[in-house]
Amino acid sequence: MGSLLMERNFMVEDTFTNGKLSKKEKILFLIKFYIIFLVVFFILSYFGKYLIGIVTYLSYIFTKIIISDARLADNFIYLPNNTVEVVEECTGSFLIAGLLALIIVYSKNIKEFIIGIFFVLLAFFVNIFRIVLICYLVNMHPESSYLYHEIAGYGVILTLVPVLVIGYLKIIEKYRHSSNKSHL
């Protein structure tokens, strides 16, 4: 995980700063990222029960659109052919903490931060989509529920997280480029 972040950080640095960061600045970026990530993650973990409730409810609402017989009780979504339990790991708090840490460390002003918050909300709803997709698949194929949880769950996360991160970085790059042009 750390080496992946280092590679991504250097990709970010090379792509968006033309390789102008010193080794000290790179290390400082990573230290800030990890500290902010841990703080945000622990805050989200502290509110884990509430977050589970919110994620379960929103997942249920969207699942109900495609599976009208779905029922909700606590953090369980009861489907006609299966039951899905939403636990703390399903909330996306790890993903949200990482994305928020990147945004806090990388943003240079409030506009960039607000753009980043949009991507955090998008990540939150991508996670809801992931749970709804799992509900749909495990209801259609109850005998393979674990397989669909793994494939759909990780497939969505591993596909859309890089898209969100790269999308955020590209938008910030365009914003910074247009801001620099207007100052010339």
UniProtKB/Swiss-Prot annotation:
TM ranges: 27-47, 86-106, 114-134, 151-171
GO cellular component entries: plasma membrane
Keyword tags: Cell membrane, Hydrolase, Membrane, Protease, Transmembrane, Transmembrane helix
Main location as per UniProt: membrane
Catalytic-site annotation from UniProt: 90, 130
GO annotation (BP), single: proteolysis
Domain of life: Archaea
Pfam families assigned: Exosortase_EpsH
GO molecular function: peptidase activity
EC number in record: 3.4.22.-
Subcellular location(s) per record: Cell membrane
Enzyme category, top tier: hydrolase
Membrane topology: Multi-pass membrane protein
ATP-binding is among the record's keywords: no
Function summary: Transpeptidase that recognizes and modifies its substrate by proteolytic cleavage of a sorting signal. Following cleavage, a covalent intermediate is formed via a thioester bond between the archaeosortase and its substrate, which is then transferred and covalently attached to the cell membrane.
Family: Belongs to the exosortase/archaeosortase family. Archaeosortase E subfamily.
Protein name, per record: Probable archaeosortase E
Organism: Methanocaldococcus jannaschii (strain ATCC 43067 / DSM 2661 / JAL-1 / JCM 10045 / NBRC 100440)
